């Protein structure tokens, strides 16, 4: 369906209602999706997002309508959403551009002494990343949280910036969004999603120089168990993010 939509220049929203490998509890690869965003990245006119909160979806859908039916772009959107119940916060001020471009700072690190770390989460695992902040605070580590709505869009934009800089060496070099956002931050960077590690690893080449980057993901087969146990088994729960 994804490739057919690409070839036919279809427009619209393709919504996967069981985001990630731990949201719908089943077995194997068919019922626990840890790879659809890896596949969707191969379709050039498929714009993929893995949002967590309702306000993120609202911004993405609004922008999709503008691009597809206002600007008449031959693109379509792939959104993965959860069937899990959890509270949705109010939208942080000024985060719309970051939602559209693939990442924004959801929670700033608390001021104080001690080491600092940058935590990036997406989709079903963003809330595990939020929970990891509390665990790290108990160890004296301050953590900022970034919501990655689309690692694929971050990579695509960064590759285009890299290309333009190579083609126009006489002009001032542009900076990719992901590089710009993280350049003023401190400490190692840890990313966790409900997808294979290769998904979040897409941005590794575009991180600020000298930064350590570790990716947690759901490689392997799924299992029949609770979400809590699945996330522990696949090493993407709050404890694995923190420790």
Regions found by a protein language model. Give the residues of each.
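Ferredoxin-type iron-sulfur electron-transfer modules in oxidoreductases and energy-metabolism complexes
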Residues: 53
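Thiamine diphosphate
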Residues: 12-13, 18, 22-30, 41, ...
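Buried hydrophobic packing segments
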Residues: 1-5, 61-64
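Acidic (Asp/Glu)-rich catalytic clusters
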Residues: 2-9, 208
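Surface-exposed loop and adjacent secondary-structure segments within mature catalytic domains
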Residues: 2-3, 30-38
């Amino acid at each position: 369906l994804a490739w057919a939509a690409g070839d036919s220049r279809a427009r619209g929203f393709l919504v996967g209602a069981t985001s990630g490998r731990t949201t719908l509890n089943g077995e194997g690869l068919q019922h626990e999706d840890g790879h659809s965003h890896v596949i969707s990245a191969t379709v050039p006119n498929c714009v993929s997002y893995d949002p967590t909160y309702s306000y993120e979806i609202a911004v993405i859908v609004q922008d999709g309508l503008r691009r597809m039916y206002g600007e008449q772009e031959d693109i379509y959107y792939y959104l993965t959403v959860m069937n899990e119940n959890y509270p949705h916060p109010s939208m942080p001020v000024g985060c719309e551009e970051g939602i559209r471009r693939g990442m924004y700072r959801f929670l700033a690190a608390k001021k104080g002494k001690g080491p600092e770390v940058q935590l990036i989460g997406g989709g079903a695992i963003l809330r595990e990343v939020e929970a990891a902040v509390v665990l790290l605070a108990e160890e004296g580590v301050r953590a900022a949280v970034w919501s990655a709505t689309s690692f694929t869009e971050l990579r695509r934009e960064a590759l285009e910036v890299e290309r333009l800089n190579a083609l126009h060496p006489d002009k001032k070099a542009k900076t990719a969004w992901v590089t710009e956002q993280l350049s003023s931050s401190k400490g190692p960077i840890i990313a966790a999603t409900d997808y294979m590690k290769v998904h979040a690893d897409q941005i590794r080449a575009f991180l600020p120089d000298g930064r350590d980057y570790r990716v947690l993901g759901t490689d392997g087969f799924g299992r029949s168990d609770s979400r809590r146990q699945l996330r522990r088994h696949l090493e993407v729960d709050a404890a694995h993010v923190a420790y």
